[in-house]
């Protein structure tokens, strides 16, 4: 069989982080080891019944099995606008400032196609979701890193970026609550970022996939669209995947500056055929009726977080107590690199975790635990780690 070479843009990519982890996990499982996966952030709990029932009803409508609108059902976009108004007190025009996505990863990956030309400077903040940099490089963008350091509360040091860089920058990707560090950004950070972006005409791309996964009602994560002036320069990606246990459904939204939303929409109308309408109808129900469910989910994850933090502290592993996200971000024990520690834990105990350096060099010295198994399995996982 002929072996064809990859395009240069693919040939230079490092292996995708989670694909590498899956390979080692399969090798360990083949030895008969009981695997506890704390790697990928994929909720273990089912989609709520009321959303599934809504999908069943929507799937019975013949019209929903035809091609959907490229921009998404207006009814879904209206419900997104309603939810933003209720949750963040943000006014959105559902016709021009909301776009339906086939999952937020799809929208984030397509965004540079619309707005990044070869040679454009793109700022990313590692440790972070690898797609920001990969998608930008695919379009010929030049990626510059603003590292997230623990001593700066895992916020990029905006003051360390000189005026010339801001003038040259096309866009900056930020993500709060943050994956993988679980950090939250205060209003003052967003205000400063939006001020800089407006001054230098920089696009702010905010990945807000974890805003509903918080543990303190008195410190709820912000939407960047709450910040005065954000509508001038920002687009925000949000998703139903994590809060509603709908990762496999692939339904999300982009909101914000109308020209940014329209540009992304133009890419999508040429690259995909929209989200299944029955899923959009079910998502309407989730956004409209899901507040009580979300409160229950937050309680479950809060207990899991506390279980992991207590167990890690007991064996001498230190970490901050996260106030949001599905993750615990902890330092590796002295004498290990991130990859060495995570690989040893997986090979000797069957516990899957994510090495911090998989999110960029700034993540070296850390590992990430996903809170996506029940308390009993979490305790068992940390017990196995302690046995090393």
Swiss-Prot record:
Pathway: Amino-acid biosynthesis; L-lysine biosynthesis via DAP pathway; LL-2,6-diaminopimelate from (S)-tetrahydrodipicolinate (aminotransferase route): step 1/1. Pyridoxal 5'-phosphate binds at residues 70, 104-105, 129, 179, 210, 239-241, 250. SUPFAM superfamilies: PLP-dependent transferases. Belongs to the class-I pyridoxal-phosphate-dependent aminotransferase family. LL-diaminopimelate aminotransferase subfamily. Coiled coil: none annotated. It comes from Oleidesulfovibrio alaskensis (strain ATCC BAA-1058 / DSM 17464 / G20). Its EC number is 2.6.1.83. GO terms for biological process: lysine biosynthetic process via diaminopimelate. Homodimer. It catalyses: (2S,6S)-2,6-diaminopimelate + 2-oxoglutarate = (S)-2,3,4,5-tetrahydrodipicolinate + L-glutamate + H2O + H(+). This is LL-diaminopimelate aminotransferase. It holds the Pfam family Aminotran_1_2. Involved in the synthesis of meso-diaminopimelate (m-DAP or DL-DAP), required for both lysine and peptidoglycan biosynthesis. Catalyzes the direct conversion of tetrahydrodipicolinate to LL-diaminopimelate. CDD domains: AAT_like. Keywords: Aminotransferase, Pyridoxal phosphate, Transferase. The keyword Transferase applies. InterPro entries: Aminotransferase_I/II_large, DAP-NH2Trfase_DapL_Desulfo, DapL/ALD1, LL-DAP_aminotransferase, NHTrfase_class1_PyrdxlP-BS, PyrdxlP-dep_Trfase, PyrdxlP-dep_Trfase_major, PyrdxlP-dep_Trfase_small.
């Amino acid at each position: 069989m002929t072996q064809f070479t990859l395009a240069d843009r693919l040939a230079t990519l490092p292996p995708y982080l989670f694909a590498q982890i899956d390979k080692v996990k399969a090798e360990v499982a083949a030895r008969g080891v009981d695997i506890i996966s704390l790697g990928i952030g994929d909720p273990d709990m089912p989609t709520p019944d009321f959303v599934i029932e809504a999908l069943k009803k929507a799937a019975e409508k013949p019209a929903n099995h035809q091609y959907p609108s490229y921009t998404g059902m207006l009814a879904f976009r209206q419900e997104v606008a309603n939810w933003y108004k209720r949750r963040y007190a943000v006014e959105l025009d559902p016709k021009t400032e909301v776009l339906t996505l086939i999952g937020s990863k799809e929208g984030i990956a397509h965004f540079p196609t619309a707005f990044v030309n070869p040679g454009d400077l793109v700022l990313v903040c590692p440790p972070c979701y690898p797609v920001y940099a990969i998608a930008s490089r695919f379009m010929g963008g030049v990626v510059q890193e603003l590292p997230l350091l623990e001593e700066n509360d895992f916020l990029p040091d905006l003051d360390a970026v000189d005026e010339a860089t801001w003038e040259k920058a096309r866009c900056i990707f930020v993500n709060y609550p943050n994956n993988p560090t679980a950090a939250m950004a205060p209003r003052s950070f967003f205000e400063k970022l939006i001020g800089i972006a407006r001054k230098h005409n920089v696009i702010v791309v905010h990945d807000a996939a974890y805003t509903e996964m918080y543990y303190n009602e008195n410190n709820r994560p912000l939407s960047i669209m709450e910040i005065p002036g954000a509508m001038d320069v920002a687009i925000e990606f949000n998703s139903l995947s994590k809060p509603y246990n709908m990762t496999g459904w692939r339904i999300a939204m982009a909101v914000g500056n109308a020209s940014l939303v329209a540009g992304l929409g133009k890419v999508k109308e040429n690259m995909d055929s929209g989200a299944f309408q029955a899923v959009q109808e079910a998502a309407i129900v989730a956004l409209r009726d899901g507040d009580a469910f979300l409160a229950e989910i937050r309680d479950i994850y809060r207990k899991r977080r506390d279980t992991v933090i207590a167990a890690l502290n007991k064996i001498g592993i230190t970490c901050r107590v996260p106030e949001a996200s599905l993750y615990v971000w902890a330092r590796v024990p002295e004498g290990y690199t991130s990859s060495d520690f995570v690989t040893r834990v997986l090979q000797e105990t069957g516990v899957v975790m994510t090495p911090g350096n998989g999110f960029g060099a700034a993540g070296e010295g850390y590992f990430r635990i996903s809170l996506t198994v029940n308390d009993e399995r979490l305790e068992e996982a940390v017990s196995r780690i302690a046995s090393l």
